[in-house]
């Protein structure tokens, strides 16, 4: 194991970096190979990337599916091959067509893409098609058509609008379920308005309860100082159960707990905390019995 303990790091990813670039940098800085992330950000995007270090990579499973918040710029007036600014332009709208797009039409288009919707992911995405990433198939020259899937856009707000002759830039804020593509929202809004659209800029501002304002810049990152210890991380994600010494020992050895008085959630993870304050593991209650979902090595936990 490296010099650093187990926990989460909140990184403010710079533009131009892949999520894997960030993981590779943190591996070097932290001196451990055991680094993973809770959801990819496109290279063009900036903002919050949640990393797990050492045994806390096991927590990432429970963060990947969390609600996300973004701010971004949707550019109306052109459709692109990737649904973002990095793709080749497929078609441009005439200035007259753009000028005819009413603010009320934009509001109606946004409303139609809010709530529980069926969304077709961008062809240049990390969605797997027969075991191979869609973007890899596109780069190999294949035609990729992905099926629509259900996503939830719980908020889609227009923050500001800027009109030019060849484009309308919409600054937006989106709160959505995991698996929602903001690029696809840009594409679909442009298509609804008949002028084409793509994503010109994107910043992820929140993942679950973690806000980008708590995130650290890579350029000045000191992993040990920035680390959210595993116990603190799990306590902010889940309900907590304080164990006795005997219960902590039993759980660490894989035994099930029998707790008649538990009144917390059932069928979802609970953070099991030892009397010392360290995280023993994640457990799940079924009836009066608790089974271990994830164990955490005692020597790693801060």
Swiss-Prot record:
| Reactions this protein catalyses | uridine(55) in tRNA = pseudouridine(55) in tRNA
Give EC number(s), comma-separated.
5.4.99.25
Has UniProt tagged this entry with the keyword tRNA processing?
yes
Asked if the keyword tRNA processing belongs to this entry, the reply reads yes
Q: Per its UniProt entry, which superkingdom is the organism in?
A: Bacteria
Q: Which GO terms describe its biological process?
A: mRNA pseudouridine synthesis; tRNA pseudouridine synthesis
InterPro entries for the chain: PsdUridine_synth_cat_dom_sf, PsdUridine_synth_N, PUA-like_sf, PUA_sf, tRNA_psdUridine_synth_fam2_C, tRNA_psdUridine_synth_TruB, TruB_C
Q: Which UniProt keywords apply?
A: Isomerase, tRNA processing
GO-annotated molecular function: RNA binding; tRNA pseudouridine(55) synthase activity
| List of catalytic residues | 42 (nucleophile)
Belongs to which family? Belongs to the pseudouridine synthase TruB family. Type 1 subfamily.
Q: Which NCBIfam families match?
A: TruB
State what this protein does: Responsible for synthesis of pseudouridine from uracil-55 in the psi GC loop of transfer RNAs.
Name the chain's protein: tRNA pseudouridine synthase B
